[in-house]
Curated annotation (Swiss-Prot):
CDD domains membership: CCP
Extracellular side: 22-240
Gene: IL2RA
Main location, first listed in the record: membrane
Protein name: Interleukin-2 receptor subunit alpha
Biased composition (Polar residues): 87-98
Signal listed as a keyword: yes
Entry-linked PROSITE patterns: SUSHI
Keyword Cell membrane: no
Ranges in the topological domain labelled Cytoplasmic: 260-265
GO cellular component: membrane
Localization per record: Membrane
GO molecular function: interleukin-2 binding; interleukin-2 receptor activity
Disulfide-bond pairs as recorded: C24-C67, C49-C80, C51-C82, C125-C168, C152-C184
Length: 265
């Protein structure tokens, strides 16, 4: 019965003058480790009235909330109401308790760079208020022209290559979402892009045998260089001593020759 009522609501939305809105066929694209959020909702957007487990919609309640309005003001039409599945005559009004607000999974993103507040623009509704015993996940039916914004979840950082947003557009009679240019990577991860060289392995990352071989080879080279240096030093010292001896002998011969020449005179 609910499915027939929902179909009737969709047909009414499309056929009533002034309420025409082209629904997007698919959901916004999913990005790994990222969530999306609409900062404002275009007129014609619908939100299913879903209740958490153990609760159901009241019989006279609406199946969905609808963003409607005029050129100056837009708001959500209808209200979602949930009642306990075990109690038929108990109807609970829309005033969520603080504990239930904490339990409810919110789709709102906390971003330091918020896009332009579209809710201040004509033809847009703000985030609809929560209702008591609401389901943990909200299901929206977006219309053409809707924009959603993406943000990485906690523990991941964004690598931007372009706009981190997706827009529902009509192309050749079919609706499609543009692909957001966002990549989310872990805080400790290093992404490998084309043209980026891998870091060379350090000696600490090599096997023990290879490291030992490297150290042994290096030590041998150092010892060989030290031995060659020592031999050069010894050879140089011996050469200097020999030259000094020759010079001393030459001086001695000259002195003796001079003394002998003086005695003869």
């Amino acid at each position: 019965m609910d499915s027939y009522l929902l179909m009737w609501g969709l047909l009414t939305l499309i056929m009533v003058p002034g309420c025409f809105a082209e629904l997007c066929d698919d959901d916004p694209p999913e990005i790994t480790h990222a969530t999306f959020k609409a900062m404002a909702y275009k007129e014609g957007t619908m939100l299913n009235c879903e209740c958490k487990r153990g609760f159901r919609r009241i019989k006279s309640g609406s199946l969905y909330m609808l963003c409607t309005g005029n050129s100056s003001h837009s708001s959500w039409d209808n209200q979602c109401q949930c009642t306990s599945s075990a109690t038929r005559n108990t109807t609970k009004q829309v005033t969520p308790q603080p504990e239930e607000q904490k339990e409810r999974k919110t789709t709102e993103m906390q971003s330091p760079m918020q896009p332009v507040d579209q809710a201040s623009l004509p033809g847009h509704c703000r985030e609809p208020p929560p209702w008591e015993n609401e389901a943990t996940e909200r299901i929206y039916h977006f219309v053409v022209g809707q924009t959603v914004y993406y943000q990485c979840v906690q523990g991941y950082r964004a690598l931007h290559r372009g706009p981190a947003e997706s827009v529902c557009k009509m192309t050749h009679g079919k609706t499609r979402w543009t692909q957001p240019q966002l990549i989310c990577t872990g805080e400790m991860e290093t992404s490998q892009f084309p043209g980026e060289e891998k870091p060379q392995a350090s000696p600490e990352g090599r096997p023990e045998s290879e490291t030992s071989c490297l150290i042994t080879t290096t030590d041998f080279q150092i010892q060989t260089e030290m031995a060659a240096t020592m031999e050069t030093f010894i050879f140089t010292t011996e050469y200097q001593v020999a030259v000094a001896g020759c010079v001393f002998l030459l001086i001695s011969v000259l002195l003796l020759s001079g003394l002998t020449w003086q005695r003869r005179q």
